[in-house]
Amino acid sequence: MPEPSKAAPKKEAKKKEEKKEEKKEAPPPQEHKDEAPDDVHPPETPDPEGLFLSKPQNVMVESGRDVTVSARVAGAALPCAPAVKWFKGKWAELGDKSARCRLRHSVDDDKVHTFELTITKVAMGDRGDYRCEVTAKEQKDSCSFSIDVEAPRSSEGNVLQAFKRTGEGKDDTAGELDFSGLLKKREVQVEEKKKKKDEDDQFPPEIWELLKGVTKKSEYERIAFQYGITDLRGMLKRLKKVHVEPKKSEAFIRKLDPAYQVDKGNKIKLVVELSDPDLPLKWYKNGQLLKPSTKYVFENVGLKRILTIHKCSLADDAAYECRVNDEKCFTEVFVKEPPVTVVRGLEDQQVVVGDRVVLEAEVSEEGAQVMWLKDGVDVTRDDAFKYRFKKDGKKHFLIINEAELSDSAHYKIMTNGGESEAELSVEEKQLEVLQDMADLTVKASEQAVFKCEVSDEKVTGRWFRNGVEVKPSKRIHISHNGRFHKLVIDDVRPEDEGDYTFIPDGYALSLSAKLNFLEIKVEYVPKQEPPKIHLDCSGKAAENTIVVVAGNKVRLDVPISGEPAPTVTWKRGDQLFTATEGRVHIDSQADLSSFVIESAERSDEGRYCITVTNPVGEDSATLHVRVVDVPDPPQSVRVTSVGEDWAVLSWEAPPFDGGMPITGYLMERKKKGSMRWMKLNFEVFPDTTYESTKMIEGVFYEMRVFAVNAIGVSQPSLNTQPFMPIAPTSEPTHVVLEDVTDTTATIKWRPPERIGAGGVDGYLVEWCREGSNEWVAANTELVERCGLTARGLPTGERLLFRVISVNMAGKSPPATMAQPVTIREIVERPKIRLPRHLRQTYIRRVGEQVNLVIPFQGKPRPQVTWSREGGALPAEVQTRTSDVDSVFFIRSAARPLSGNYEMRVRIDNMEDCATLRLRVVERPGPPQAVRVMEVWGSNALLQWEPPKDDGNAEISGYTVQKADTRTMEWFTVLEHSRPTRCTVSELVMGNEYRFRVYSENVCGTSQEPATSHNTARIAKEGLTLKMVPYKERDLRAAPQFLTPLVDRSVVAGYTVTLNCAVRGHPKPKVTWLKNSVEIGADPKFLSRHGLGVLSLLIRRPGPFDGGTYGCRAVNEMGEATTECRLDVRVPQ
């Protein structure tokens, strides 16, 4: 057949295109109205109520060209001019803002609106589905279409033109096909296509910018769906290549690292390296230009530019930038803070309602962030009227302006490296009497003053006389000055006598005193009158006793009379008082003698005697002065026991009670090292043992005690030794029995769930008989591990066991075993657990040590015996047996010790045995009778006999060496050969050889070789080459599919490829079939065949492209066919 001309294919292609267009334009037959036409994209049936006269059609365009789609809308029937929007995908609106999209709108005389969308230089990223939406007030309509972009077509019109034939004839049979021209052109074509694809396979600029800014992987799928990108995998590959290929910097050789970290207070260096030392460089911090200073130091070292930041603080934690002209590099500096610790912690405080509370703590760093907690709950700054937070350098304050009862709690300050806790106790405000009123005895016309002092300056009150309120008048004055309340009565009269009471407002408290009126009767006295003391001292001594508080003033006013005026003397025992000044003095008047002690002391207590004398007579009286004081401090204050948050304090009464009975005691406590004491009770405590609660476990405390009597409070006692509230642990858990014998039981347990700050010092194990309550200690000393073997138990008894954990706080509650245990040996059949490596022959070399541990089991303890082949063990073999294993030991192995050793374990009539096969080996002796049996050509046959001594091991092989008799240099020709004969080849002609052989076993080769007695002489002879006839092989074979087609299910609109592999010789002719019909030159299908791999590419398949596809291969030897099913799914 003559070679077809170039024009013929073009004409045929034009005819096919015309026929295809005719088929496409021809209306479908009436009887198949409901079926879709056989096309890739079936035309959409227009909605009869739609606004479109013509809708945009699906378009296929080559990459790099412009494409235009148009839509026509009838505007005559619309209430207003229509407006059109173009979308890619579902939401991406196309507009004039993009440089590659142009929109046009025109109207003709019939009010038909034409809208056009033009995309210039179409790229592969423009492929996808598009939507056109038209609106006119409330009317709305839309339609969809697609744009498919294909690679630019080759300029070659006919592939057959690339083929050449080697023959001179022009028919098909002349010569063989020459593919060289095609391959050369294809190489150029592939390079051009690849270059063109790299240039054209770009995304639109707006999509590309979106893809560059994506941080989450899920965003890629959303963008692809939004902009109609169907080739998601290709998009990701392209984007990955762009990310992997960093842009090479022209200014920087080495840029900054992405991030740096430095500890607070240290310095850090940021280093870049420039390509040119003359380039200008600037440093920025958070966008602000940095200038050289003592903190920021700039250095130039060759091409390196260094920024040094000294004494980094939290303010230096920022983003830094280095600029060289238009190029930049960035980094972040993270300043790491050291953990902030609490240097001085909080202190316990005790206040009353309304007081101002300041909780103060000091931390290790200024400006540190702290957290305040109240009973474990964060104290927020929302309650600004109640809580106030203050910072002063390293000190932090929590201020409560007016304390309330609800503020009583444990307060904690927390930092990232420590914490401190303190207790705040708010009590009801108590009114204290600082100075009580005293009884008064006044004369007529004198002034009476009642005065008292209370603890609160703001407290007011009222005065009463015999239950009737006293009102101010000209003679009666009531005053209130700070803590002092005063009632003054001028010109006292007899009716003013009575009981006076002061009652503070709002308190159930009253202060009382008595006013005695001393009436003076004027009588006629003769000139001579004996002296007389006007005191009634005839009663009991208690009535004549005057009680005074130490430190107060004592004034004994004694009325006297007599004519002439008597002489007054005061005595205490033999001591005579005459002084008129000083701490103790006497004031004398005509009718009154006063004995005054300015500040009473304990030594002033005693009997005082006053004597008055004149010439007429003498009189005397005795007064008892009793000085009372606050008691001495309590003695022997100590802490007797502690708990998790409590401690028991005990003490002894003071040796001196101050002259008044002890009414009770007051207690205080503080944290060790603190200066602030906190009261534990406001009302006196009568006993000498007190339990303090609400303490913090693990914190050291100190306590002290005050004694109280009617006079006041004593000095504090000595502080107790520092103690720590620690609770006993909870009971141990999971108490179980592990083992039991006739007299022992092994108990195991787990540590307590709650241990606390005191830890666990050890455990006690106790046992008792079932039904009894008498517990017997199994161990006298604490055991630290969680297990104990109790020994000396009664055999056959049922016993209960319990475990108690002990720490410095005491014993925990016991954990008792649930069931009683019968103390009797549990019989367990003896069994030897022979290790796996000892179940076969155990091989050791001579001189090595043998140390084998063979475990066994059985209860009670089995009896273990060893024997060697029924006899006793050699003296060199030693055994040691424990409760659970036996040790077989040989210090230095020798060959006579090889053999079978038997181990037996026996319990009563039960027995188990195991055999240990021991073999002690060494190197073998040399082989025997090595001789050359035959010599031919360049070969020699050697033969020998096994060695007499095999080293007590099997001979694993032989090593053969040869040597030329002239040089006697030995060369190994064979190793690990098991037969006792071998052939040595490739010997040099004309030489004479001697051979030697080594024997070999598991220990190695023999010490000495065995040398052959005779030699092998290789004679020189001529060589003859005999050619083997060559038989040509028939390589022809029928076609056979190595990889058949596989059923596929794809989504409509996504390109699919069907692949298979075939072999055969001569090369088979391949035909693709669809539904048993041959696929012609349809541009929708592209078939490829390379090195036996066949592929059929189906572009953008539609629902009607589904069916059965087949591939048929035919050559002169036969035919082969493979088929598959292709299902095309339409997305919902």
Swiss-Prot record:
Protein name per the record: Myosin-binding protein C, fast-type
Entry similarity comment: Belongs to the immunoglobulin superfamily. MyBP family.
Record keyword Transmembrane present: no
Organism: Gallus gallus (Chicken)
The keyword Lipid metabolism is annotated on this UniProt entry: no
Any one Gene Ontology BP term: sarcomere organization
Ig-like C2-type domain ranges (all copies): 48-149, 249-338, 339-429, 430-530, 531-630, 830-923, 1039-1132
GO molecular function annotation: actin binding
Domain Fibronectin type-III span(s) in chain numbering: 633-729, 731-826, 926-1022
GO cellular component: A band; C zone; M band; myosin filament
Compositionally biased region (Basic and acidic residues): 9-44
Key words of the record: Actin-binding, Cell adhesion, Immunoglobulin domain, Muscle protein, Repeat, Thick filament
Primary role: Thick filament-associated protein located in the crossbridge region of vertebrate striated muscle a bands. In vitro it binds MHC, F-actin and native thin filaments, and modifies the activity of actin-activated myosin ATPase. It may modulate muscle contraction or may play a more structural role.
Superkingdom, natural source: Eukaryota
Region described as Disordered: spans on this chain: 1-59
InterPro entries the UniProt entry points to: FN3_dom (IPR003961), FN3_sf (IPR036116), Ig-like_dom (IPR007110), Ig-like_dom_sf (IPR036179), Ig-like_fold (IPR013783), Ig_I-set (IPR013098), Ig_sub (IPR003599), Ig_sub2 (IPR003598)
Pfam families: fn3 (PF00041), I-set (PF07679), THB (PF18362)
